[in-house]
Amino acid sequence: MFLVKSFHEGGLMMYPILALGVVMVYISLERLFVLYFRMNLNKDHFFKSLTTYLLKGDLEGMLLVCDQNPAPLSKVIKTCLIRLINKGTDADIQAALDEGALIEVPKIEKKIGYLSVIGNVATLMGLLGTITGMILSFKAVADADAATKAAMLTKGISEALNCTAFGLLVAVPAVLIYSVLQSRAQHLIDDINEVSIRTFNFILSNRERFGVTEAA
């Protein structure tokens, strides 16, 4: 098989590049599933359901909406609602939203930065393999006898080119998927910020209904 043959011709540097590729695939699949499925939540539908229960004064219903949608957004809002149920001040509610965001945002951004690192390191590993292959080629030209010179020169060039190719084969998808995941993470964080502000303003505009007092 062409890929297997190319891998063996690439020399020792192919193994760390392969390891980086395996890690890249694992992180990519895991983060794509988490960010696009497990953490997915329609913010407008969620906020509409939430305000319906808020206007009714149905505290159990509010928490049920959050529990039925176990996404970072709903978890942040749930911390706010718990503080509301406990008759916190507007400052307490704002602090609860901030606390919830500080807990959930790192979960959204988790592992994504590793893909950028893998992309850079895989490129450098490929470059290092290229350099070692070229060293082998120059050594063949300088030191080897005529009988082995052609074989060593071919081996060195093959090692250099295969390392470059495999390094880029890992680096390019890593960088592309990093960009996709980073964009998705920012979208989820923006949703948290938007719905947090909308919920906080909604509570303040119905201060008397919920018994929310101003901070001293």
Located regions from the model:
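Predominantly long cytosolic amphipathic alpha-helical stalk/bundle segments
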Residues: 40-128, 132, 136-146, 180-216
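Charged/polar positions within long, soluble alpha-helices
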Residues: 34, 162, 166, 201-204
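Residue-level signature of catalytic and energy-coupling elements of molecular machines
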Residues: 11, 25, 62, 77, ...
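Hydrophobic membrane-targeting segments
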Residues: 1-46, 181
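Alpha-helical transmembrane segments of integral membrane proteins
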Residues: 14-27, 116-123, 129, 170-174
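Loop-to-transmembrane-helix entry motif
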Residues: 10-14, 104, 108-122, 156, ...
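Pore-lining and gate-forming transmembrane alpha-helices of multi-pass membrane transport proteins
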Residues: 151-178, 182
